[in-house]
Amino acid sequence: KEGYIVNHSTGCKYECYKLGDNDYCLRECKLQYGKGAGGYCYAFGCWCTHLYEQAVVWPLPKKTCN
C-alpha cells in the first residue's frame, strides 16, 4: 500500500518542498508506519511506500484539512 501521510488531528497531508528524495518525508513515514516504510516528496506532500494494508493515509473520512 502507498499514500500520503496524514496528520490525524487536522486531516492535512504532511507538506514538503524538496521534491523527490526527502529526508523529512522518509523519517516521518518510518515514524508513523514503521521502519519498513519508505517515503519521498510528491506533489508537495510526503508520499509513503511499503505500508501495511490497514495503514491510514490521506484523506481521512469526514475530516477535511483546515
Curated annotation (Swiss-Prot):
It comes from Centruroides villegasi. One of its GO terms (cellular component) is extracellular region. Keywords: Disulfide bond, Ion channel impairing toxin, Neurotoxin, Secreted, Toxin, Voltage-gated sodium channel impairing toxin. It comes from the Eukaryota. Residues 1-66 form the LCN-type CS-alpha/beta domain. This is Beta-mammal toxin Cv2. GO terms for molecular function: sodium channel inhibitor activity; toxin activity. Is susceptible to be slightly neutralized by human antibodies scFvs 10FG2. Beta toxins bind voltage-independently at site-4 of sodium channels (Nav) and reduces peak current and shifts the voltage of activation toward more negative potentials thereby affecting sodium channel activation and promoting spontaneous and repetitive firing. This toxin is slightly toxic to mice. Disulfide bonds join 12-65, 16-41, 25-46, 29-48. Belongs to the long (4 C-C) scorpion toxin superfamily. Sodium channel inhibitor family. Beta subfamily.
